[in-house]
Amino acid sequence: KAVLIDQENKPIAQGSHTWENQLVDGLWTYSIEAIWSGLQDCYADLRTNVKNAYGIEIETLAAIGVSAMMHGYMPFNKKEEILVPFRTWRNTNTGRAAAALSELFVYNIPLRWSISHLYQAILDNEAHVNEIDFLTTLAGYVHWQITGEKVLGIGDASGMLPIDPTTNNYSAEMVAKFDKLIASKEYSWKLQDILPKVLSAGKNAGVLTPEGSKKLDASGHLKAGIPVCPPEGDAGTGMVATNAVKQRTGNVSAGTSSFLSLIHISEPTRL
């Protein structure tokens, strides 16, 4: 969905596109082609609705933001080629990895988190792992392609690897434990090297590039240079949209899956 809001944050137009995930080789995925054709169709629908409602063409905007499904696995090599088809949050083949990491980190690591997908690929001795240059989520991927910036909003990043609330970055302790865990593999990378840079809300996350504008607007009317905010996951976006942003608040999301998001007073501890 593409939503256009005014200066008072009220929706004034929208566009949409319907897509379905595919089960390929036992794993749920969306193709790269489906991602971009869907985004272009969605933006084109928004553009048409704006022209019909207001008689104007969209050429520039105050800002753009990308939100998408959290978690999953999108590894890329140095040539910016995806190494395996996008593995979405729906995949449950990561049981061994999630259990092992939960014990190692003394922290609950769900099946869907990116670190679970990465470690499962390592446990399965998948050949592509040594070639990884960048690992990101769907929102992080789209943002990277339209701005050139390998960054991720702190909410979406927390679904890749736990965040240390004192540093607003990935847990240094967990990063070190993971690197030690896989040291015998002698991969060409360390974990911190391949993860997106973590950004808090409001931080500079780049601008729409000329190439990025063409990826969104096939008609060529959308101009480059528009600021783009840190890309976020659907859960964090939903919490902001429902004003669940303070401690002791939360919200429930019900759609493809159902989950409760809460803001704790302090870091939960294991009894």
Segments and roles (model prediction):
Residues K1-I32, E81-T88:
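Short glycine-rich, Thr/Ser-proximal phosphate-binding strand/loop in the N-terminal lobe
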Residues G26-T29, D41-S266, R270:
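Glycine-rich phosphate-binding/catalytic subdomain of phosphoryl-transfer
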Residues A34, G38:
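Charged catalytic carboxylate motif
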